[in-house]
Amino acid sequence: HFQSPPFTSAEALQKIFDLTIKLSEVVGKIKLHVVNFTKLQTEIVKRVPSNYTMTSTRRFMLRIAEEVAKREGCLALATGESLGQVASQTLESMNCINNVTNMPILRPLLTMDKVDIIKIAKDIETLEISNLPFEDCCTIFTPKAPKTKPRLEKIVAYESRDDYSELIDETLASIETYLFDKNGRIITQDIKENKEKKEEKEDFSDLL
């Protein structure tokens, strides 16, 4: 999950926790990675022409997601895009977004009708939570006229004007991870901290 505090609220994050709890009851244990996206996202808005900021934002999200996936040993990424539903979900847009990763991208909802997607959400009891009116980091920075058919060469040119590597590293370092069991309980909070403490302990023991 990508959040951009203070532009996104604590209620918006709680909504994600509530959705994760519901999903864990359906699919079992879930690991939730919360990415603090504020600094990188605000720089995208400053540096990229407004009608291309949505495309660029999605591209950077995918870059971050790919790094997390590699750390976790995942072989693919999965998104909830449905073709034609919003500006960022056209074939042209997906082509531009896909370009930043070599990982397979699974889109199980791609050709599903909105009515069918809503039915699934009702069945697994996530629809009501999803409809809560808390803005996410995509909606708060939505441009007035997002490009529905972006051109790859243009977005590559816009992003190549600046070096984002330091911002990407900072964003990756900001990630907090939570593990939910099949009953929706948090069984490990901020795994990154626990892992670092364990590594510190191991390093110290080597000195004994």
Give the ranges of each region predicted by the language model.
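Peripheral terminal appendages
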Residues: I30, C74, T90, M94-M103, ...
